[in-house]
Amino acid sequence: DKLLLTLGSWPIVPNFEGIDLENILLCKNYDHAKIIDEKKGSAKNVIIIGAGYIGVELAEAFEVLNKKVTLIDAEDRIMSKYLDKEFSDIAEKEFTNRGIKLVLGEKVVRFEGNNGKVERVVTDKGEYDGDLVILCIGFRPNTKLIEGKLDTLKNGAIIIDDYMRTSKEDVFAAGDCCMVRYNPA
């Protein structure tokens, strides 16, 4: 018998003060997308936290809907893990020309709100008003099930070889729960 593990991943949700305020959302799956779709109509100031692929796509989508968009990232440029500076500079210029506010090199410290709803994101360098906040700051492998049973990286990703074999014979793993075998970024 063989076992193939496809445990997936889940968005990273830091334990920031105010994280439980209404209208702070995740973006990973269909259910998250439905909630974002429901909330987009009433939102005026949208803050996207995380300027990777998902965050950048969301910023563009909300700009097309004529929302005031702020894109916050701790890195000093958007898509820093995927594009070199020459290309990210072009994308950043296009974003700012379209009215998207880029807040780069700042780390989120907390969320503030009123009547249980988010109103503001506070970073280590500033404060930004927003009535809808979407967290796009990365994912963690869903590997609690195999903790202590298979070899993993520090982040919990299952270590695999070129044939998706794990540290246990006849146990294979694929997808977001595994380490990345090739990542030029």
Where are these regions (language model features)?
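FAD-site-proximal beta/loop scaffold in flavoenzymes
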Residues: 20-41, 115-120, 127-185
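Hydrophobic/aromatic beta-strand patches that form the interior of the parallel beta-sheet core
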Residues: 4, 25, 47, 70-72, ...
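Rossmann-like dinucleotide-binding cores of NAD(P)H-dependent redox enzymes
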Residues: 34, 45, 53-110
